[in-house]
């Protein structure tokens, strides 16, 4: 169906979001058009504000509005342990269980030979720099239980073990193919408590 240009452009914008197909994009566009002008303005203001005010922590790579982030600057955190994650959303999932008290490092992706993503394409160099200048004795690899997550964890293990750093992996309990972001708190707690050395 042909829609007026402003609606078609809005549908196109929504359809660029991950997981949003054309039907959902159309529903969102029409819902947005039906919102009050004040609500649309607030939505637009919040979207622009988030884009403008958020940055990545220069230490851990987590999405934050402070640099360095509040976790990296918290002196009560365990400075000897770093939990390595794929995405900033995974940090929030781990923080929700309130049992991990160490530091984080966000890779912003995983090694994926099939997709042409090499170790140089993810946030590994800053992790190595961090480890050289710190008292870290353990790195917990908390990548998703996928082929790319496994490839990344094995690469980190081979890279860090010769440096005398203990490398562990979250225990199974996370289903193969599952995303950490969507795991419940009990599953995450058991996974971190029962992590295994690589």
Swiss-Prot record:
PROSITE patterns: RECR, TOPRIM. Gene3D superfamilies: 3.30.60.80, 3.40.1360.10, 6.10.250.240, RecR Domain 1. Disruption phenotype: Mutant is sensitive to the alkylating agent methyl methanesulfonate and the DNA cross-linking agent mitomycin C. One of its GO terms (molecular function) is DNA binding. A zinc finger (C4-type) spans 57-72. May play a role in DNA repair. It seems to be involved in an RecBC-independent recombinational process of DNA repair. It may act with RecF and RecO. Plays no role in chromosomal or plasmid transformation but is required for resolution of chromosome dimers occurring as intermediates in the formation of merodiploids by transformation. Belongs to the RecR family. This is Recombination protein RecR. It comes from Streptococcus pneumoniae (strain ATCC BAA-255 / R6). The gene is recR.
């Amino acid at each position: 169906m042909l829609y007026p240009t402003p609606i078609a452009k809005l549908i196109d914008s929504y359809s660029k979001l991950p997981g949003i197909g054309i039907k959902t994009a159309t529903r969102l566009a029409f819902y947005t058009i039906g919102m009050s002008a004040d609500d649309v303005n607030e939505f637009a203001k919040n979207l622009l504000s988030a884009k403008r005010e958020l940055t990545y922590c220069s230490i851990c790579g987590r999405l934050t509005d402070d640099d360095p982030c509040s976790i990296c600057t918290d002196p009560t955190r365990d400075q000897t342990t770093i939990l390595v994650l794929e995405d900033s959303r995974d940090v929030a999932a781990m923080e929700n269980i309130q049992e991990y008290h160490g530091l984080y490092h966000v890779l912003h992706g995983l090694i994926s030979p099939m997709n042409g993503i090499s170790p140089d394409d993810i946030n590994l160099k800053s992790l190595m720099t961090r480890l050289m200048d710190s008292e870290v004795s353990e790195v917990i690899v908390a990548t998703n239980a996928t082929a790319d997550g496994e490839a990344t964890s094995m690469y980190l293990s081979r890279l860090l073990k010769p440096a005398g750093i203990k490398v562990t992996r979250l225990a199974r309990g996370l289903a193969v193919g599952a995303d950490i972001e969507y795991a419940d708190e009990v599953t995450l707690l058991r996974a971190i408590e029962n992590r295994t050395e690589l």
